[in-house]
Regions:
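PLP-dependent amino-acid enzyme catalytic core
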Residues: 1-323
């Protein structure tokens, strides 16, 4: 098993902020324009990044801190969409080849985004794709594997979101973050823990797969059922063992939402704030609408790369079928 992942310190986070200058946007923090909320809710709009998600921070910091010689033969990753698109987008601009391994049921819209960069896409059965993530490598690949979850540079890049939240809303009480592998939630929690201890960071999960909630209940990483839905980007088979000590220490708890509540959150974001969010990103708002807090709550809207057909179905009041 790989060694446990360590949290970034303030030097790591500040270095990441400097590397990302001119690449990642300093995204706005806006008040949710919805009256029926248990607390003041604010939206951190990472869906406005050039690649449509926060992944430009993690992938950007990894690539900008990597040895250029190691990048010459190309880069590859395993992703359900957003990490792969961010890597492919960055690789195109750096003039290096990129390959993205996706699960066979990856959303068509996200595959199209990756393809438009010129990157190679390799679709695998879910179990084989998950093996690439767990092993941090793929058989036969000659390039550098880029890990958007466990790489310390990825977590430090994600931590810059926490810096921005505290700068814009120092009185924040709770931050709700979608939980995929734990890289973004732990990055934000690391920054917040250094600057404003006591601020809660909650993992937002969908009822279809609850790796963090289940691990927290069991006291260790456990395998969970991963039922398919229209949501991609969160809901893994387990918390990666090397991430478990970090997520256990940094995250205050979790909130689990049903599919219909997440579809409702997508609709609320669009109708009330004209924000386009994908299912994973809207999971933060779905969770926040049930959270009791003593002060303002921030939802990190991690991405907006939603399939058009899914968005149309939701705006008509439905819940899309699985991809």
């Amino acid at each position: 098993m790989s060694p446990a992942v360590a949290a970034p310190d303030m030097d790591d986070i500040m270095a990441a902020e400097a590397r990302l200058a001119g690449l990642a946007l300093r995204t706005p923090l806006v008040r949710l324009n919805y009256p029926d909320t248990p607390a003041e809710i604010y939206l951190k709009l990472e869906n406005l990044q050039p690649v449509g998600s926060f992944k430009i921070r993690s992938m950007g910091n990894i690539l900008r801190s990597a040895d250029p010689q190691k990048l010459r033969s190309g880069v590859y990753t395993a992703s359900s969409g957003n990490s792969g698109y961010a890597l492919a987008w960055l690789a195109q601009r750096m003039g290096i080849p990129a390959t993205v391994y996706v699960p066979e049921n990856a959303p068509a819209g996200k595959r199209a985004l990756i393809s438009h960069t010129g990157a190679q896409i390799k679709a695998l059965p879910y179990a084989d794709w998950w093996d690439v993530i767990c092993n941090h490598s793929a058989s036969g690949e000659q390039g550098l594997y880029i890990d958007a979850v466990c790489d310390p540079a990825a977590i430090a890049g994600n931590a810059t979101i926490g810096l921005e939240i505290l700068h814009d809303l120092p009185q924040v009480d709770t931050i709700v973050v979608p939980f995929g592998g734990g890289g973004v939630s732990c990055g934000i929690a690391a920054a917040v823990g250094l600057l404003k201890p006591g601020t809660r960071v909650l993992a937002a999960e969908c009822e279809m797969s609850t790796p963090f909630t289940s691990a927290r209940a069991a006291g260790q990483a456990v395998a969970v059922e991963n039922r398919k839905s229209f949501i991609s980007g969160i809901g893994a088979s387990t918390v990666l063992p090397e991430m478990w000590p970090l997520v256990k220490r940094l995250l205050s708890g979790s909130v689990v939402s049903p599919l219909n509540a997440i579809a409702d959150a997508i609709r609320i974001l669009f109708e009330c704030n004209r924000v386009v969010a994908e299912g994973a990103g809207a999971t933060a708002l779905a969770g926040a609408l049930t959270v009791q807090a003593s002060g303002p709550v921030v939802c990190v809207i991690t991405g907006g790369n939603i399939d058009k057909a899914h968005m149309m179905a939701i705006l008509r009041g439905g819940v899309p079928v699985a991809a």
